[in-house]
Amino acid sequence: DKEMNGGKGDRVFLERIFHKLLLNFTWWVNLKDEGGNNIFGGGFLGMDNIGVFDRSAALPTGGHLEQADGTGWMAMYSLNMLRIACEIAIENPVYQDMASKFFEHFLHIAGAMQAIGGDKLNLWDEDDQFYYDMLHKENGEAELLKVRSMVGLIPLFAVEVLTPELL
């Protein structure tokens, strides 16, 4: 928007959309992080055809699924919100705290993908060099669903470049 308007972006729009996105982000954090460990599952991303089964439905065997793509998407969402908050904070420093909040969310999510809970389970498989969904069975066992699909690539989308003028 800035490039098309002589270096001046639509901050009013950016603030409005930030608050709507904040509501959606909060919904994901509160309702789709089943274990409270910054690993997400059970949400419809509009990409549910990339898994090997319907991940919006309950598992027929019980247990639950922790989704590499849903978690990676939330990491990316955190970085997108960080970027928007930094942009708004240029003129309204109140948003600096929000930028910090989303940076912390990103760090927690990225860390959780490498060490889930006290068992230190990973969505990343070091041998395969790939992310996988993790199936948590009702008996407490957990295993990676080693299917190479888009599921394992989505976490790689969580990248952001912050320029010095935004910091």
Model-derived features with residue positions:
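Carbohydrate-active enzyme catalytic cores, enriched for enzymes
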Residues: 63, 129-167
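Well-ordered alpha-helical segments within folded domains of soluble proteins
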Residues: 1, 71-83, 148-159
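Active-site acid/base region of carbohydrate-active enzymes
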Residues: 3-76, 89-140
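Short, solvent-exposed secondary-structure capping/transition elements
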Residues: 2-6, 164-167
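Juxtamembrane interface elements at the cytosolic ends of transmembrane helices
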Residues: 81-88, 165-167
